[in-house]
């Protein structure tokens, strides 16, 4: 397979969102992939996240994320981009996009293209089978594949590297 574009999601792939919710907010985050979330759980989580005005810039790297990113970015360069969602305006996270840019530039690369969108806009970046999305959320992978792209659900950096190798990309 030849890669036209490789898009990295941030939260849960590169940035450890769940650890941030636990350590910065003192809360166990509701499952992002499960069906066991209530609107009340989400509201409480976002209320606590909002207390740290620059929450996204304070997140840690996911285990192995830097090595995974460097391996892919080192091979594909400007064919790699960040495709990350930000919270809806009702969540009051006015600095989310700016903080994600700062985070990527500080920890990964100042040169990589950043695409900051609402979650449901991600599939609009898909141009076909050779357009790859690495994302931790099942629903994002499902939507991406429905648009004809290749989705890799990130379980861990090692697992994602193995999947990229299976596709002949690494």
Residue ranges and their predicted role:
Residues 59-61, 65-97, 104:
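Substrate-recognition element of Asp-dependent hydrolases with the DxDx(T/V) motif
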Residues 12-15, 20-21, 86-90, 119-123, ...:
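Short, solvent-exposed loop/turn segments at secondary-structure junctions
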Residues 92-99, 123-127:
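Metal-dependent catalytic neighborhoods of phosphoester/phosphodiester hydrolases
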Residues 1-49:
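Active-site neighborhood of HAD-like aspartate-dependent phosphohydrolases
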């Amino acid at each position: 397979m030849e890669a036209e574009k490789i898009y990295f999601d941030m939260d849960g792939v590169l940035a450890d969102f769940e650890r941030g919710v636990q350590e910065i907010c003192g809360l166990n985050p509701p499952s992002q992939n499960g069906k066991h979330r209530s609107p009340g759980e989400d509201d409480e989580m976002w209320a606590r996240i909002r207390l740290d005005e620059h929450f996204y810039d304070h997140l840690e790297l996911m285990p192995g994320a830097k090595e995974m990113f460097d391996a892919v970015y080192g091979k594909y360069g400007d064919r790699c981009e960040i495709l990350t969602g930000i919270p809806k305006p009702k969540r009051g996270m006015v600095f989310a996009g700016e903080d994600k840019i700062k985070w990527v530039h500080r920890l990964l690369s100042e040169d990589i293209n950043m695409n900051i969108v609402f979650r449901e806009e991600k599939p609009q970046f898909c141009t076909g089978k050779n357009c790859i999305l690495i994302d931790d959320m099942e629903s994002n992978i499902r939507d991406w594949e429905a648009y004809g792209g290749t989705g890799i659900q990130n379980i861990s950096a090692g697992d994602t590297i193995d999947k990229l190798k299976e596709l002949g990309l690494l």
